Design a protein with these regions (language model features):
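Conserved ATP-dependent adenylate/AMP-binding module captured primarily in the ANL superfamily
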Residues: 3, 14, 18-49, 122-141
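Motif I (Walker A/P-loop) of helicase-class P-loop NTPases
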Residues: 2, 117
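Hydrophobic/aromatic ligand-binding patch that stacks against planar heteroaromatic rings
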Residues: 5, 28, 148-151
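ANL superfamily adenylate-forming
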Residues: 36, 42-95
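Conserved pre-ATP/AMP-binding loop-to-beta segment of ANL
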Residues: 80-103, 110, 120, 133-139
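Conserved AMP-binding/adenylation subdomain of ANL enzymes
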Residues: 11-12, 122-139, 145-166
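Short, acidic/turn-prone active-site loops that include or flank metal/cofactor-
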Residues: 12, 18-21, 59-65, 163-166
Length: 166
């Protein structure tokens, strides 16, 4: 849900996962210089100790002690609780606007950030919808990580088994 909210806002998401290792994650995040890092407590602990840039926000509710320990300024949960009263309309991002930075595996050298535009992500979504006949209300059980992310974007009711996507 957070990824889709960021894309709708026009925020550029940077996806770097643990498969890069601490050295690779540090290189990726320092290179991307994000304004915010949203993560689970283990990722936030790494962000604090490795001096990753960006304001730290927890993906899980934390108590006050945990927030201070991790240097967290809030949680996604707290923001969602504050804004339950209504919706906010944002202008749609331009099709050519940057949407995401996804990192290569690093199997042939250091992982590299690949920038995708709003148009490219929409094109991938539309190609999969057309190829597999997805429409709003379709059902999807995703065993392949990219399809797990695309399911909700396709309007499909999605179930994703617990899996390690790295």
């Amino acid at each position: 849900t957070l990824i889709y909210a960021c894309l709708k806002l026009g925020a550029v998401i940077v996806v770097a996962d643990t498969g890069l290792g601490l050295k690779g994650l540090t290189r990726a995040l320092k290179g991307a210089n994000p304004q915010f890092i949203v993560g689970i407590p283990a990722a936030l602990a790494a962000a604090r100790s490795l001096l990753w840039p960006g304001q730290r926000i927890s993906a899980e509710p934390l108590n006050a002690f945990q927030e201070r320990l991790l240097g967290v300024s809030g949680s996604v949960f707290a923001v969602a609780q504050k804004n339950q009263t209504g919706t906010v309309d944002f202008p749609a991002p331009a099709p050519g606007a940057d949407a995401a930075v996804l990192y290569t595996s690093g199997s042939t050298g250091p992982a590299k950030g690949v920038v995708y535009t709003q148009r490219q992500l929409a094109g991938m979504r539309d190609a999969i919808a057309h190829t597999y006949g997805f429409e709003e209300g379709s059902a999807l059980v995703a065993g392949f990580a990219p399809f797990a992310l695309l399911g909700p974007a396709l309007g499909a009711t999605s179930v994703t088994p617990k899996m390690d996507v790295t």
